[in-house]
Structures are given as structure tokens and as C-alpha cells.
Amino acid sequence: IGYRNIKEKHIALDIAKELGSFLKKEMPELNIIYTREDDIFLGLKNRTNLANKNKGHIFLSIHANASTAKTARGFEIFLLQPNSVDNAIDVAVRENASIIFEDNPEQYEQNQMFASISEKAYSQESEKLAVSINTAVKTELPRTRMRGVKQAGFYVLVGAAMPKVLIEAGFITNKSEAQLLNKSSYRTQMAYGIFKGVQSYIESHNSQNINR
């Protein structure tokens, strides 16, 4: 919960749905799978299981950031790196905290042991995806502060057998950014920026495969 009780779950879901709408309209050949379409809680592992079950090619985990530092603001993207020791670990700790509501939280510690091995198969493509989204959002939202692409051990990304990134759309604990995120028009702009990044990544990826 952020400034004036703005809730991350509502912000993130709306951006995800807007993103899905852009993808369906501009790239109808894609099959868009949502981990949730209303106000329900789905365990972190169940989200990646759903993506794997549907043989997903890209996994996007969309969130709104928070910090005790009210001045913290900006858009950032994270890649999976279980052994991260930089300040990104604070974000990972917060995003991973939801496992306390699950039946078997110990499973995540076990899965993290294998994450660094399995991640190597998708790390390069995940980085390309992250850079593409970051570049597009910067273009579509030039006044938004860009915090860059970082790495941390996010449980929600562990086990997804595909390129995957975690997106933090902005800080709901920052007054000005929370007010922006609370506007439908801004969330649509944000979703469009993410869409353009995904579209660019897919087109580049497909082009490389054709030229091989």
C-alpha cells in the first residue's frame, strides 16, 4: 500500500491488462496468458508453473515498487540472479515476502539452489528482453526516471523455462509517482511502452532465427 492507500495489486493488474490489449491488437498471433485477471492471490511458484504449462515464450512479472525512502522513484527492470548482493536485494526481499501466505514456503529455498544453473539457458535472452523494454519505456515516457536493468533473486522468476523479467513500473510510496500511477492514462502509456519493448524484442528474435 502506497501514498494515500494506493494498492500495488490494482496498479499492476491494470498495466498487465492494458499490455495484453496492445499485444492482442498489434500481434494477434500471440497467445496471452494472465496469471490473474481479478483480485486473487496466486502463489509465486504457481505463476511460473502456469507459464511453463502453457509453453510460454516470454514471462513478464509486473509490479509497482515501494520504499521507506519517500524520494525513491523511477522505472526499473530486474533479471534473475540468485547471488545478487547489490541494493536490488531490498526489492527482491519485498517481492519474495508473499511466500508467507503459501503452504510450503521452504520450496523456494530449494528451488533457488538450482536457479543459477537453469537460468544460464535463458539469461542472454532475458537481458535482451529487459534492455528492449527499458529502451522503449524511456522513449514513450521521456519524463520518467529510468533506474536501469538490475539483478536479484526473485522467487517469482525461478523455474520459468523461458526469457523472463520482473518490471517495477514506479514507486507507489513516492507522492508524485503514485499520483501518476493512479491515473489510467499514465498506466496506459506505461503499458504501451512495455508493449513496444516486447514487440521489438520478438521481432528482433524472430529475425535472428530466420537468418540462421
Residue map of PLM features:
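Active-site-adjacent mobile loop/cap segments within catalytic or ligand-binding domains
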Residues: 6, 68, 115-212
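Catalytic-core regions of hydrolytic enzymes
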Residues: 1-110, 119-131, 211-212
